[in-house]
């Protein structure tokens, strides 16, 4: 998948335009957000449940290396194979090699974010193995070659007419229709054939349980269950932070994930695999290969602050509540993970230099933090990344590749910080700036300004600087008060 | 050579993780239990039925196995089913579905009738109008079915056909997921797969429009026995 | 009489001094004695939010030097209060002596409505305003400080005022400091939605407790809906009080 995080501002502008043209787009996250509220209300103490989710994820990260070893040991004891990949390339190449060795003509995929992160589809195609996305939304955007608009509803923004044309051309649909149910039915028939004949299935996973060596997937469509039932070979890919200590923890995270994601008490299907099929079982994989992907995470893990971003369980509650995501949609974020989740993860995965706009395009409103079932403090992380741009000399900045700020900004804050601890300088600075600032003001309002602050004035006014600041007034009339 | 490369990636990753600064493990906050934990047997069955129906499932209640078979016959006739795929699990075994099929002239198949995976897949994907299974558990908390997949419970029976009919003895209804998982993972070997099924296969991926039967069953019918 | 030290945010000092004046009169009316340290400048938020921690630290130390001995510090801004309460201890975490001073100061810093209602136990300031009022839950007031009931109690106690509900009242207005200027496409769309919700609420007036939101929403209203008003809670209460007299 192409990375376009550096075009954030431009893409965000396009996103705003699209949402303006189609107000229904903004309703998607709002609808999911409302469902989430109702879903959480079914728990006796939602706040305690969320806090417990945060504690579980925090513990899982604290014990990460031990839990991974425990998981690996138990998964192998269950009969699974475990492959460790340092990078996206290592993971993709391994899966391609395995698919070739097994003689797979195509690969059926269950919906997963990690395989997008490692660019598996591209790698498979290059080697002449067709990847077929089993999830309806992923299937649509795969054929359209566009990024996911929303992590759990990747094609929710695509017009039915576009889908109709796509299915007529590419998915053997017989009669043109724009009815979502008939379109869904056409996709069912087409993908059913792929599920039926599949010899090689690839899925991601939501949780890996250290205690039992079990992997767990949540879904509503059944594409993942098919990918884990029909083929002879099942490859399940996980990033290394997916591991949880116990089955009990996994059940709690499952409750939270379903509710925070779609407001469901539990998603339609939850499948838990402990090894490949056993003798006498007629379906299920003959071999189960679990690929544990690092792709930069062990490096992120070195930094105790940045590490907190790895708590994420990909529920998308933060997207749905984010006022910025609601305006711009998923494309602007430029890679796999959109919304606040992406704003805290992608800078670490791709480097701060390629993602500076992402973590600066945030008002720090804290809505994401307030809904996160994993206890991620997104605003603090974004402030941290911003500081790494500025203090290029600290080791973390080197690790994540901070990108220098404009010299004018740096100079401004240098001057600012000199004045901020000297009030006389601060106040004389104000007196000096006032005539400049108020040059174009009219009746106490500034309506236009060129240069560095022009962005504000496109659609907004600003009050002129007061003839007397509060400070100056206080000096004069404090005796009256 | 190959082995060494694999091992080194593993060790490299783990060593890096182990070398990182340690952080404390937080204390877990107290959580009040779900209200289902306090329910009695009858209440559990009602709660299960209520929740399962809320997930657009359909519930029939039967007093005993004979009654369950009658109900099943009714469903099969109403749906106009010619052939069904059935599991051989311990819930279904006493119902003797093959004999029942002959009596009502419906072709009853089970995985044992097939030479292997491919033949079985052909039938379960394209040759049957419904899959019939027992369940190992049913969970009142969310109206959820729990199925342990093994040689008597093939995965595709509850997944590939457009209709899934599950026979649920009331004594298999438990309050919460924890009650299920504790027994499924009580001792090794663990089942190759364990699934929770809650309602039909569905999607909202096209403009948020709910579409049931995306890949799996469009409807799930439960016959609650006992 | 309870002495309380006022922190005047730089946005208020420079552009919205009437909010500071309103705060003075409100505090006095509520039976407190507001004092003002001449040496105050800025809490340091702009620097911290742009990543300039070293520079923000200077502001923090200056603030602590100035306000460190005060029994109570009150400011008409949730974000400035949040800066002092939450970010100062974090910023100064690597300097034990300063950290201790920051941590000791933190619980004594209040947002204005919080101070009036929770500390002075005053919710009726004796004001009158005939009309419908909507309240914007500013991010740093609501989620930053958990302050929401206090301003609503103060508004509801104003004679003749009806507090009406507003859709998405807890959604960010799109200010975010430099964000508003640097990402105008997004920020404008956000403030448009906020104003749309305000207009749809049928309120005559929008009240809030954060100068940043006031500049943003007010700036947009001034350009597009000059007949509609947005006010800081302090100004509203003080002005409504004057109308009464």
Positions of predicted regions on the chain:
Chain B
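The feature marks the mature, well-folded catalytic cores of soluble enzymes
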Residues: 2-226
């Amino acid at each position: 998948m192409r990375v376009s995080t550096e075009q954030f501002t431009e893409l965000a502008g396009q996103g705003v335009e699209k949402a303006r043209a189609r107000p229904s787009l903004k309703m998607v996250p709002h609808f999911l957000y409302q469902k989430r509220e109702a879903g959480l209300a079914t728990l006796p103490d939602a706040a305690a449940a969320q806090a417990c989710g945060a504690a579980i994820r925090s513990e899982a990260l604290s014990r990460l290396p031990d839990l991974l070893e425990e998981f690996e040991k138990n998964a192998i004891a269950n009969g699974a194979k475990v492959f460790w990949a340092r990078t996206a390339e290592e993971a993709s190449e391994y899966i391609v090699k395995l698919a070739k060795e097994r003689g797979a003509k195509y690969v059926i995929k269950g919906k997963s974010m990690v395989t997008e992160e490692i660019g598996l589809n591209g790698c498979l195609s290059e080697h002449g193995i067709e990847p077929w996305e089993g999830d309806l939304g992923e299937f649509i955007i795969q054929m359209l070659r566009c990024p996911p608009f929303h992590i759990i509803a990747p094609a929710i923004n695509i017009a039915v007419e576009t889908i109709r044309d796509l299915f007529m051309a590419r998915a053997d649909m017989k009669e043109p229709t724009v009815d979502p149910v008939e379109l869904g039915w056409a996709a069912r028939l087409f993908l059913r054939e792929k599920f039926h004949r599949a010899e090689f299935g690839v899925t991601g996973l939501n949780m890996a349980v250290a205690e039992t060596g079990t992997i767990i997937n949540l879904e509503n469509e059944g594409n993942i269950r098919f990918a884990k039932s029909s083929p002879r070979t099942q490859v399940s890919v996980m990033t290394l932070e997916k591991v949880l200590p116990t089955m009990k923890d996994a059940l709690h995270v499952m409750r939270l994930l379903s509710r925070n994601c779609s407001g469901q008490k539990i998603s339609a299907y939850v499948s838990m695999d402990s090894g490949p099929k056993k003798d006498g079982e007629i379906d299920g994989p003959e071999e189960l290969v679990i690929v544990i992907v690092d792709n930069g995470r062990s490096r992120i893990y070195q930094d105790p602050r940045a590490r907190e971003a790895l708590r994420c369980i990909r529920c998308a509650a933060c997207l749905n509540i984010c006022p910025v995501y609601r305006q711009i949609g998923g494309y602007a974020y430029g890679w796999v993970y959109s919304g606040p989740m992406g704003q805290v993860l992608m800078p670490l995965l791709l480097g701060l230099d390629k993602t500076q706009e992402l973590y600066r395009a945030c008002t720090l409103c804290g809505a994401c933090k307030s809904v996160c079932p994993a206890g991620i403090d997104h605003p603090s992380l974004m402030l941290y990344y911003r500081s790494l741009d500025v203090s290029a000399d600290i080791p973390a900045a080197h690790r994540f590749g901070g990108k220098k700020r404009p010299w004018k900004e740096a100079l401004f804050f240098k001057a600012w910080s000199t004045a901020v601890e000297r009030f006389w300088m601060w106040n004389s600075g104000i007196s000096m700036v006032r005539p400049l600032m108020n040059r174009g003001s009219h009746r106490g309002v500034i309506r236009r300004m060129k240069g560095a602050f022009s962005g504000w004035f496109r659609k907004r006014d600003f009050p002129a600087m007061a003839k007397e600041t509060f400070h100056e007034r206080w000096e004069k009339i404090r005796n009256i008060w | 050579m190959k082995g060494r490369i694999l091992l080194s990636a593993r060790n490299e990753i783990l060593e890096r993780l182990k070398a990182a600064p340690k952080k404390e493990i937080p204390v877990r906050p107290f959580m009040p239990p779900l209200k289902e934990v306090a329910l009695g047997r009858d209440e559990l069955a009602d709660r299960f039925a209520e929740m399962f129906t809320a997930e657009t499932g359909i519930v029939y209640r039967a007093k005993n196995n004979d009654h369950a078979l009658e109900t099943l016959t009714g469903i099969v006739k109403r749906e106009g089913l010619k052939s069904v795929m059935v599991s051989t699990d311990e819930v279904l075994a006493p119902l003797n579905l093959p004999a029942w099929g002959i009596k009502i002239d419906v072709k009853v198949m089970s995985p044992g009738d097939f030479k292997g995976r491919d033949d079985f897949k052909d039938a379960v994907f394209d040759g049957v109008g419904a899959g019939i299974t027992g369940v190992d558990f049913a969970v009142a908390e969310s109206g959820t079915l729990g199925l342990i997949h093994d040689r008597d419970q093939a995965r595709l029976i509850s997944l590939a056909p457009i209709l899934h009919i599950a026979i649920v003895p009331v004594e298999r209804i438990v309050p919460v997921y924890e009650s299920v998982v504790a027994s499924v993972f009580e001792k090794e070997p663990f089942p190759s797969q364990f699934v929770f099924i809650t309602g039909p296969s569905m999607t909202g991926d096209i403009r948020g429009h709910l579409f049931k039967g995306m890949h799996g069953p469009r409807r799930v019918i439960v016959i609650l026995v006992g | 009489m309870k002495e309380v030290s006022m922190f005047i945010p730089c946005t208020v000092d420079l552009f919205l001094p009437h909010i500071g004046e309103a705060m003075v009169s409100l505090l006095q009316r509520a039976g407190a004695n507001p004092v003002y340290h001449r040496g105050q400048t800025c809490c340091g938020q702009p620097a911290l939010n742009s990543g300039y921690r070293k520079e923000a630290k200077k502001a923090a130390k200056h603030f602590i030097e100035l306000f460190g001995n005060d029994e109570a510090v009150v400011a008409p801004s949730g974000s400035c209060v949040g800066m002092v309460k939450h970010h100062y201890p974090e910023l100064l975490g690597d300097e034990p002596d300063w950290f201790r001073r920051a941590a000791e100061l933190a619980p004594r810093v209040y947002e204005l409505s919080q101070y009036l209602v929770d500390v002075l136990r005053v919710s009726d300031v004796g004001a009158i305003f005939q009309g419908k009022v909507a309240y914007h839950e500013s991010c740093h007031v609501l989620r930053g400080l958990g302050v929401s009931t206090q301003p609503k109690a103060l508004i509801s106690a104003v004679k003749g005022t009806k507090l009406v509900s507003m859709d998405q009242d807890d959604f960010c207005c799109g200010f975010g400091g430099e964000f508003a200027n640097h990402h105008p496409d997004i920020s404008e769309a956000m403030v448009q939605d906020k104003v749309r919700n305000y207009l749809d609420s049928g309120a005559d007036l929008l009240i809030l407790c954060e100068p940043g939101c006031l500049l943003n929403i007010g700036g947009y209203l001034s350009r597009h809906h000059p007949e509609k008003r947005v006010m800081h809670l302090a100004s509203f209460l003080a002005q409504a009080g004057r109308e009464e007299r």
